[in-house]
Amino acid sequence: MSKVLEQKQQVVAEVAAKLRDSKSTVIVDYRGLNVAQVTELRKQLREAGVEYKVYKNTLVRRATAEAGLTGLDEHLVGPTAIAFGVDDVIAPAKVLNEFAKNNEALTIKTGVIEGNISTADEVKALAELPSREGLLSMLANVLQAPVRQFALAAKAVAEQKEEQGA
């Protein structure tokens, strides 16, 4: 086997493994972004713990077939970059969606969220969700609200009794 073929097979295996292992994957069209914009995007994604890489579409097609993800081939046209989120489901979608709002040249094509192929609209909807920490704080506030209201009511009753007694 030639070295080039071996390298391509390694890339296909690498992409297939990343597709299987990542919690969410977002595929974008980066056509029209200049070097400074791409550098800024990569920096933001790196800070969020997201891997961002450009692969040849033919190699990604083979990797999606190897990973068992059919239905992505139609989106693998033109300049395509892939963002892999291993730890956080929302991070790739959130960073790319925010960047796309400020830079019209970047468009979200599709995504794979926990093994399910998603449309661009579904990826954008996922990006609008609060982070895990935000959701946990909302849950804590909801759970604390009845206790807080009871404490305020008990305090009001105590103050009322104190006024009547005085």
Curated annotation (Swiss-Prot):
The keyword Ribonucleoprotein applies. The gene is rplJ. GO terms for biological process: translation. This is Large ribosomal subunit protein uL10. Keywords: Ribonucleoprotein, Ribosomal protein, RNA-binding, rRNA-binding. PROSITE patterns: RIBOSOMAL_L10 (PS01109). GO terms for molecular function: large ribosomal subunit rRNA binding; structural constituent of ribosome. Forms part of the ribosomal stalk, playing a central role in the interaction of the ribosome with GTP-bound translation factors. The lineage of its organism: Bacteria, Bacillati, Bacillota, Bacilli, Bacillales.
